[in-house]
Each structure stands twice: as structure tokens, then as C-alpha cells.
Amino acid sequence: MKITVIGAGNVGATAALRIAEKQLAREVVLIDIVEGIPQGKALDMYESGPVALFDTRVSGSNDYRDSADSDIILITAGLARKPGMSREDLLQKNATIIKEVTSQVMQYSKNPILIMVSNPLDVMTYVARQVSGLPEERVIGMAGVLDTARFRSFIAEELQVSMQDINAFVLGGHGDSMVPVVKYTNVAGIPITELMSIEKINAIVERTKNGGIEIVNHLKTGSAFYAPAASAVEMIESIVKDRKRILPCTTCLKGQFGIQNVFCGAPVKLGRKGVEQILEINLSADELKALQQSASIVEQNCRNLDALLG
């Protein structure tokens, strides 16, 4: 198993290290356009192997040819958000970057699974699919896992219980229009509505929607990277080990939830082939409407890029 990570910034480097530490691949390649950065970080990671107890070969490069024959390619390249900048502000600039990155990696790997982390996430997943020509089930966006992790952590913090006992789904686009599904949220099987007032639930939903911005405002000069990297690696682990985890991921919906040909967050079964099944769970009327509105925003942003994609 060979996994390439595009982008040696905070998210990419953290993800590469977690992949190595979990020994999910025999080889991890970290690629970035800045000379010396991927090489230095990769060497540092590799030298941690004896004490972190892994034998994965980690290398860095500025040459896409070193990504050849990758099984999974994690794309984290792109501009990070700054305070006051929405994900949509990044649209045109990052779409150009992702178009180039995808074109490059597809020259050297025949049928990889692409996992997108770059923002605006849902739209960049669409760009990668259009440029790569890969089957839709092999181009997946990391959004719902991260948003759900934030939702779960906030609930656990409020209730003072283990995060491991919080079960939840956050669907829809990765942004202000995401849809935390309260109906399927429980604590060790106990419905969240029996443990928390609607007012507190709604406050946590709003905090989840602004989870990324909250971190950006703290950091001032960067954005979240530990949780995004961990979320991406959770997806990779399910694929590599063919665990068939049910995870909320950005995928191309084909009529599910009344949404047609739009990349949007939904519960999927994630295995060795990528997205092996989309689970069309029952939603309340309000949740379904919110999900469809979220998908509509993603679709409009995708249409705005059609000229760029040709």
C-alpha cells in the first residue's frame, strides 16, 4: 500500500505522520511545491520510527513522479482561510490549485482513491472528480467526519461524558449550511433530547457550524489541522483495512435525499473500493429541507467553476 499526501502544511504533515504511526501503508510520500519542506518533514517523521514503533518508509518530494502507483492520494494543498474569510472566498484560487494537482497525480497513478481535504471541500471534491475522470466512488471528501467529531466533542464537553459514547451524524456541505442531525444523535443509545434541552442542543449545533472559524479566530494566522488530519486518517484506515465503516463523507449523490449529481455530505459505507454504499437515512422534514438547501449552495458554487473546468 502506497499513500501520497499532497501538501506538506499542517494538515498534510500531521496526516502523513498518523498514517505512518498506524502503519497503514508500506510507503508514505509527502509532496509540496516548496523545496526542502516535504523532504525535511518526511525525514523527521521517518527518524521518529524507532521510538514511535513503525517501519513505514516516509519520504518527501517536489516531484509528482514520486507519487507514481499510489493506492490512495490525500489532497491537502491549497490556501488556508484567514480571519473573516469564508470557504467560498477561497473558491476560485483553490479550484485552480486543485485542478493542477489532480492533473499531475493522475499522470502517474492509474486508479487511485482521491480523498479531498482542501476547502471549499465539497466543491474541490467535484473539481477533482471532473479533472481525474475517476469513478465517483473513488473521489471522496473529508468533511462530515470532521464536523461530526466537533459535534460529538462539544456534546461530550457539555454532558461531561466520554466522547466515545457520543453517536452522531453531520451531513450536507462543509460550511455554514452543514446539517447536524439531532434525530440520530445519542449518548450510549440514549437520545440526546433526553439529556439536554433543545436550547443547549441548538447552541451546540451553531457552535459546530462555526467550529472551523472558532479555531481560525484563535490561531489568527492559520486554521485547524489536528482534527482534520485525524478525520482524514480515519477514512483512510477504513479503506485500507476494508473495515466498511459507516462515516459521513462528501460523495456524489444520485437521487438520494432528492439530490441529483451534487457532491454533498452523506452517510456512506467506506471500504477498499471507496464509497461502497450511500445510506439514505430518514430525516425530518426540516432536516431534509436543510440538507437540500446545503446541496443547492454546493451546486451553485460548482456551476461557477464550470468555465474553469472547461
From Swiss-Prot:
Gene Ontology molecular functions: L-lactate dehydrogenase activity; L-malate dehydrogenase (NAD+) activity
UniProt xrefs under Gene3D superfamilies: Lactate dehydrogenase/glycoside hydrolase, family 4, C-terminal, NAD(P)-binding Rossmann-like Domain
Active site: H174
Record: residues binding substrate: R81, R87, N119, R150
EC number from the UniProt entry: 1.1.1.37
GO biological process, one term: lactate metabolic process
Reaction equation(s) it catalyzes: (S)-malate + NAD(+) = oxaloacetate + NADH + H(+)
Pfam families, sorted: Ldh_1_C, Ldh_1_N
Position of the signal peptide: none
Keyword terms, alphabetized: NAD, Oxidoreductase, Tricarboxylic acid cycle
Keyword NAD (UniProt): yes
Residues binding NAD(+): G7, A8, G9, N10, V11, G12, D32, N94, V117, S118, N119
Family: Belongs to the LDH/MDH superfamily. MDH type 3 family.
Function: Catalyzes the reversible oxidation of malate to oxaloacetate.
Matching PANTHER family: L-2-HYDROXYCARBOXYLATE DEHYDROGENASE (NAD(P)(+)), L-LACTATE DEHYDROGENASE
Protein name: Malate dehydrogenase
